[in-house]
Every structure is written in structure tokens, then in C-alpha cells.
Amino acid sequence: GDVWNAYEVSAITNKGLPVVGMLKIYYSADSKLHVESKSIKLYLNSFNMTKMGDTAAECIAILKDRVKKDLSEKLQTVVEVQMFTSDHTPTYAFKGYAQLDLLINLDELEFTSYHSDATQLKSTPIPEDMAGEVIKIQSNLLRSNCRVTNQPDWGDVFIHIKPSAGFYPDLESIARYIVSHRQVSHFHEEICEMVYTHLAEAYKPQELMVACLYLRRGGLDINPIRA
């Protein structure tokens, strides 16, 4: 049979939370029809801002069923679909960074801004046991768009931050801020510098590092780091 691995699959929940993952598509070699690669790419990209389900799990289930139904009808054969999120393959270039979705319940948050909204960044009182501690978090919810082609660019963002007194980062607000780049059109380096600058201005940290590891495109992956 034929197996397709789609690495840029995403939709959003009814609360606006992006869900991202790799979609595996399989159909029999007996099929009399074949799918054209550019058309399936455009088809899958059409879900990027489509709301599906109240939670990430519901969104994935609905998206899988929708793709299976649509492709089975188009190819006139049975199509099997699986979706794998980053939870299944936590292999990252940076060690010791906590996944943001394991620190807070993203399903409970509302996401409404998708145009790099630095006003999303909020502070909370520093917990006594965290005074002077370095915060190291990562998220796979970074999506921006190429300023030339407007094609979506997908990445993981890693943040190392040592807070100053009175400026402990609110993790829920950081999640909202990362998601707010979803409809921004800039180069990878510009996005990384924007994130770094906004975090520096919002929290006045003693230490700060931002790395944006973007998915490979055209044989190249760009990984800007600012510190």
C-alpha cells in the first residue's frame, strides 16, 4: 500500500488552542486513484484555523475522522489515519526543559489572539521555593508564516529565563503569547528576536535565552537562538 506522513497537521479547539502533530495516512495499492501531494498539503493546511472539539483529544479525534472520510470518498477506497502528537516522541535538542502543556492545563484556557500580542504576557508573585530559580520551558505550539510565500512555518520554542524580583512569568500567559504568533508573517529569525524582545521587556529577567527550532523546509531547517 501507500503510506503518507504529513508533518504539518494542525487545527484548533473550540477555545482556540492549537493542536499539532504528525498524521500518518495509509491506503491499499489496489486503489485505482492516487492523491496529488500539493493538493493534500493545501487540504490539510485548510484545517489550521478550523475549530474542532472542546479539548485537544476531541480535536484530534474529529480531525482524524474528517480526513479519513474525505480521503476515502475521494480515493474510492478505505483510508486509515493515525495522528501522533509530540507526547509520543519527546526528542528535543535541549535537555531539562519542561513541556508547557505538562505544567498547565491548556484545554482550560481561552486563546483569542493570533497576531503576536505582547500584552498577553503577565506576571505573578514569585513562589518562595522558586526565588532565584531558572525557568526552562518548551512548547510545540509555535506557528508563524513566511513573509514571502505566507506558507505556515512550524516550530518548537525553548525559553530559559531567570526572573527578577516581582516579575515571575505567568505560564498561562506565556502559552497564550506563543500561540499569538499563529497568523504573523515574518522570517524565523525575526520571530525569535520578537519573542526574546517581548519577554525581556515584560519580565526584566536576570538571564534570558530563546531558541526557535523550526521544521525543515526545502531541505533546510532554521534554528535561531537569541540570548
Segment roles from a protein language model:
Residues 1-227:
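N-terminal intrinsically disordered, cationic/polar leader segments
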